[in-house]
């Protein structure tokens, strides 16, 4: 992510009327500077005259609250021409001392915020590619979803760009301002929630930073199911931060109870040299289910697809094992799976092999996905290997080495 940029997004301002909630104080400042027809140099000069450096101002890029220091706070309010309360409201906050007034005026606020009924007019969009049970669309996921009826999919899985400044296919922006990224995220989440059936489940895969915003937003409309930590394997350290070791996979249910939950079991982790258990199960060994161990909310057995021979495209792609677990856990055959960010097509490939109907969109290159679906041999082979371990306490290979070295087996 860039430390600085020349301008904020046009979508974030129009005259002095705010078009969205701001999630970064810096984004709000830059937007107001454009309203004043100021250059970036003019903006930085204003704060420099008040002994606030450019670096200090830029530090507000990732901050959704006003600075504590009075001089800094006063400079921000003076530049914006807004009171502290107005800034809080622009950031989407309702200060504690004003919450009673807010609740006392809910009906009036609701009238002011009444949405147009024309937001989701169904439109006909031609699929890029179809199978006997699936449809792939090439285009912006929000526009694609506007053509999907309410409450018609059983599972939504989304792996959006993480906004880390990576290069993807033309048209995909992975370097948005904080405010634009979160507002865009909320926009496609609204559509995902709309098309999800009651009792259906939504999974969002992202870095923890963004999932804190996503979880808070989904929690206002859906029922929390789980926050799963997916071990990211071999990540690089970040200066002055804890070592990043997981991706977040947040899951919510539309309504109170999920329509479908199929328990997933995995094999016991053993030493590949001697066959001994890596984890001590103590006196519970005799009670262990021969079909395997229940999956927890920490998934350490999902490995990233990094080797070129295993990848379908140049960019990152998701593991077949990850999608198999999510789809099998949350759906049954003939249920409908939707993925707004198709990527390399892993969701669609797995759904096709598992006999789930599917709908998907991808803004970038869809030809890669089409060829993957037309040639499923590699994915089928991966799925076959996964099922050798799935729902078995020990694989056939681990049974051999454990038997050889005198370790217990569930059937003996």
What role is predicted for each listed range?
Residues 116-122:
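Low-complexity, small/polar and acidic-rich linker and loop segments
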Residues 2-111, 124-368, 410:
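Core catalytic lobe of class I
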Residues 367-412:
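PRPP-dependent phosphoribosyltransferase catalytic core
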């Amino acid at each position: 992510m860039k430390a600085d940029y020349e301008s904020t997004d046009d979508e974030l301002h129009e005259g002095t009327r705010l078009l969205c909630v701001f999630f970064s104080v810096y984004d709000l400042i830059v937007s107001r500077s454009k309203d004043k027809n100021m250059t970036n140099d003019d903006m930085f000069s204003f704060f420099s005259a008040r002994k606030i450096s450019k670096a200090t101002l830029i530090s507000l890029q990732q901050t959704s609250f006003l600075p504590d220091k009075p001089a800094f706070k006063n400079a921000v309010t003076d530049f914006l021409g807004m009171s502290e309360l107005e800034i809080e409201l622009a950031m989407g906050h309702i200060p504690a001392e004003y919450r009673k007034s807010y609740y006392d005026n809910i009906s009036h606020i609701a009238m002011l915020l009444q949405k147009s009924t024309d937001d989701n007019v169904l439109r006909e969009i031609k699929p890029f590619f179809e199978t006997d049970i699936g449809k792939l669309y090439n285009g912006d996921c929000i526009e694609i979803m506007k053509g999907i009826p309410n409450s018609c999919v059983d599972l939504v899985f989304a792996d959006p760009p993480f906004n880390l400044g990576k290069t993807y296919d033309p048209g995909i922006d992975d370097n948005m301002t904080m405010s634009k990224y979160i507002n865009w995220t909320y926009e496609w989440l609204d559509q995902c929630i709309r098309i999800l059936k009651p009792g259906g489940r939504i999974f969002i895969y992202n870095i923890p930073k963004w999932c804190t915003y996503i979880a808070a937003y989904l929690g206002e409309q859906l029922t929390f199911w789980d926050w799963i930590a997916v071990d990211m394997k071999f990540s690089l350290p970040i200066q002055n931060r804890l070592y990043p070791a997981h991706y977040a996979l947040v899951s919510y249910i539309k309504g109170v109870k999920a329509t479908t939950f199929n328990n997933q079991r995995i094999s016991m982790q053993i030493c590949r040299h001697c066959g001994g258990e890596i984890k001590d199960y103590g006196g519970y060994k005799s009670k262990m289910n021969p079909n395997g161990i229940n999956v927890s909310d920490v998934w350490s057995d999902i490995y990233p697809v990094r080797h070129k021979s295993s990848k379908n495209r140049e960019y990152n792609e998701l593991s077949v094992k990850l999608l198999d677990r999510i789809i099998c856990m949350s759906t049954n055959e003939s249920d409908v799976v939707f993925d707004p960010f198709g990527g390399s097509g892993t969701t669609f490939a797995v759904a096709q092999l598992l006999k789930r109907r599917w709908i998907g969109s991808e803004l970038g290159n869809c030809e890669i996905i089409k060829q993957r679906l037309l040639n499923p041999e590699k994915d089928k082979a991966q799925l076959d290997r996964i099922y050798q371990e799935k729902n078995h306490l020990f694989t056939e290979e681990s049974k051999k080495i454990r038997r050889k070295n005198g370790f217990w087996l569930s059937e003996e």
